[in-house]
Regions:
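Conserved P-loop
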Residues: 1-56
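A generic structural signal for short, solvent-exposed coil/turn residues
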Residues: 17, 66, 91-93
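Internal catalytic-core helix/loop-beta-alpha segment
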Residues: 42-78, 83
Length: 139
């Protein structure tokens, strides 16, 4: 199994659990700051790093039966992942390699190339009433 997180740096608790289970985990070298403005220079650095990461994913996926591209749909929609590169990867992967592509912004042309597509929509959340993020729940 290969788990690739596009918007996290590897310090989240889910990664520690995955690594204890023997899951390969990959992360970008450039860090995306979710709620900070992205300059053109930062956008270019992220795009270059994500292109490098996609090359590494492609090389490692041949030995995997499952590849999770965490927030990959958002990286694709935000022009950070090379769009044709991701499409090519999804089309040429092995028959025994299933892909999970997560994110909020799944472009319609990617959905048919994925094995799992789930859309989650917030209808209610404690944030709506001004509650702060809680340890163990939101982080």
């Amino acid at each position: 199994v290969l788990f690739v997180s596009f918007y996290k740096d590897g310090s989240s608790c889910e990664v520690a659990a995955l690594e204890r289970l023997g899951v390969q985990c990959l992360f970008p070298r450039e860090q995306f700051q979710m709620f900070c403005p992205v300059t053109a220079e930062k956008q270019a650095a992220l795009a270059a790093d994500y292109a490098r990461l996609l090359t590494e994913i492609d090389a490692r996926a041949a030995d995997c039966f499952l590849v999770v591209l965490d927030e990959g749909a958002d990286a694709f929609a935000g022009d950070l992942l090379p769009q044709q590169g991701l499409i090519d990867f999804l089309q040429r992967r092995g028959k025994n390699c299933e892909i999970i592509l997560t994110g909020h912004s799944l472009p319609a042309d990617l959905a048919p190339l994925c094995d799992y597509v789930t859309r989650m929509t917030k209808e209610r959340h404690p944030f709506d009433t001004g509650a702060p993020a809680r340890r163990g729940i939101e982080y």
